[in-house]
From Swiss-Prot:
Gene3D superfamilies, sorted: 1.10.286.20, DNA helicase RuvA subunit, C-terminal domain, Elongation factor Ts, dimerisation domain
Keywords of this entry: Cytoplasm, Elongation factor, Protein biosynthesis
Role summary: Associates with the EF-Tu.GDP complex and induces the exchange of GDP to GTP. It remains bound to the aminoacyl-tRNA.EF-Tu.GTP complex up to the GTP hydrolysis stage on the ribosome.
Family matches, as CDD domains: UBA_EF-Ts
Protein name as it appears in the record: Elongation factor Ts
Transmembrane segments: none
CC annotations in GO: cytoplasm
Species this chain originates from: Methylobacterium nodulans (strain LMG 21967 / CNCM I-2342 / ORS 2060)
Family note: Belongs to the EF-Ts family.
SUPFAM superfamilies in alphabetical order: Elongation factor Ts (EF-Ts), dimerisation domain, UBA-like
Amino acid sequence: MANITAAMVKDLREKTGAGMMDCKSALNETAGDIEAAVDWLRKKGLAKAAKKAGRVAAEGLVAVESAGRHAAVVEVNSETDFVARNDSFQAFVREAAKVALNAEGGVEALEAAHFPGSQTTVKDRLQELIATIGENMTLRRTAKLTVEKGVIATYVHSQVSEGLGKIGVLVALESDGDVGFLSTLGRQIAMHVAATNPLALDATGIDQATIERESNILREKNAGKPDHVLAKIVESGLKSYYKEVTLLEQPFVHDTSKTVSQVLKEAEGKAGGPVKLAGFVRYALGEGIEKEEGPDFASEVAAAAKG
């Protein structure tokens, strides 16, 4: 039997909202596999679907930089929140986002890019910062959105300085319509994305493995029912799932009586033409990163006592 720790139970409770004893049972039944335990609880009807599992533990900052029809977002991680409040660190993250506007490619391309008017690359500057501050830092990821017509709207949540915060969102709206109106609408949708964390724009953007996983959970929860009934249950369940995790089908946070898709359709009159939500990017600081927890205070004292 796997060694089930209190930390594992706590982690599972945070992911699922299930009771402590149910979480312990799930971990015992799945030999301590957290993701399998999430599915076990859901099959038993003891947990809600987790759109994106994973503890968020890394420090650092997310930055966005916009230039009308194109915008970029970057995430730079540090070991401590203390460094994230450092002026030099914040300046680096902000400048890296500006460079990302014109860099083609992912992290490696951005690291190799030069700061404007300088022979120093982004990677070199980061190494200098590490040496100066004395803490490890990582340029973790970067993304960019561009439209030929329309706007790229941005939003930063938990902002610590202009364009810097814990969550950064880009939203691409393609339209020949009024730019001022599109910018306002785009920002509202970006705020929605920050709040709801959709998996994809629509159902076609969800990978097949995720769909199969949801289908299997629905089948096992309704095992024993006739095949034709089960097929309808799975179909209905997936439709509900898509409404929960796809941006266009989600209830709009600013007016939950409408979906985002309906809001876009109604916006065409004010915009003066069709409005298409072409894409979005949402970066949450530390998303999917697990940071090792240090020993508790009692353990530290015991270790020190041993010499």
